[in-house]
Amino acid sequence: MGIKVGIIGCGGIANGKHLPSLAQIDDVEIVAFCDIDIEKAKTAATTFGTVNAKVYQDYQELLKDQTIDVVHICTPNYLHCDMTVHALEANKHVMCEKPMAKTTAEAQQMLDAAKRTGKKLTIGYQNRFRVDSQFLHQVTARGDLGDIYFGKAHAIRRRAVPNWGVFLDEEAQGGGPLIDIGTHALDLTLWMMNNYEPAAVMGSTFHQLSQQENAANAWGPWNPKDFTVEDSAFGFIKMKNGATIILESAWALNSLDVDEAKCSLSGTKGGADMKDGLRIHGEELGTLYTKHIELDNKGVDFYEGETVDEALEEAKAWISCVQNNTPPRVKPEEALVVTQILEAIYESAHTGKAVYFD
């Protein structure tokens, strides 16, 4: 069955990830493009669309097209909830870019709309589809590491602040590196541990390097006056079964321990980490061992105009679930928990107190 797709938001993540991936799937036609900058929509349509692809400035007009099966939401975070709910109510299946939403309440509205309409909803956590992630998930699912009681979610950059668009705008995005890249690392860690029941969260956020002049940023200097979100954030997460997760995220941090969209796991039978390729370690025959797993591991940067493998695998899995009426690989219920924890870290950082879950 051919799938007709509409794209809402034709910026960097659409052109770098969603569109090149969808364009490689034989059963997909990208038939509609929407952006408040109509020229961006026209350019995307010319590059990736069908011959008769339509362009819009108003996403509500796109949603009126009853021939569209699937909509991808590739807009700033503050728009995710309303656009997703409206798309679901317009009888479309929806892939929404990460994070699911700015707040737990918004994410819950999205989940409720999916259940109410019977349409499929997934969130763009493409790092689950990397080769190393898939391998490690098989390891944890088999129980090779035993009971995983400690995890670290890594999302640290030294100087890689996205200083374009609305990334530095608190009102539009809901936060900085925690909600931008910390969300990927936390999603991976929860997925590997298969644990979605937080009990308590404590967090800290910092506005330190963001308020200083800088010339070493990967994308050029930022303006401290425009930097309204945190430059780094850290969380301590206690799960209901006693397991503990430490989440570290930064766009700018004076640290050489730089890793992004990675996790480390410690279990009763062994441990694993993604910090130097993929390593599995433990104790055997009275000795300690470390196994280096050789895999083709690609990067996570979608701003160089190239499609990496995990983006294509994510798109294929998503389209397949729509065609075959199977659950999405990234379930909205899981993404909701990620949003709950991120929101709790921000709240704890603001109040100085722990946040407890029922």
Task: Name each model feature, range by range.
Residues 187-283, 315-327:
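Contiguous beta-strand/loop segments that form the cofactor/metal-binding neighborhood of enzyme cores
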Residues 13, 127-227, 352:
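Predominantly a Rossmann-like dinucleotide-binding segment in NAD(P)-dependent oxidoreductases
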Residues 1-49:
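N-terminal Rossmann-like dinucleotide-binding module
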Residues 1, 70-72, 108, 116, ...:
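C-terminal helix-rich "cap/oligomerization" subdomain common to oxidoreductases
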Residues 28-32, 52, 69-71, 176:
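Short active-site oxyanion
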Residues 2, 69-128, 143:
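Beta-strand-loop-alpha-helix segment that lines the small-molecule cofactor/substrate pocket
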Residues 52-58:
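Conserved SAM-binding strand-loop segment of SAM-dependent methyltransferases
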Residues 13, 304-316:
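Active-site loop of classical SDR/Rossmann-like NAD(P)-dependent oxidoreductases
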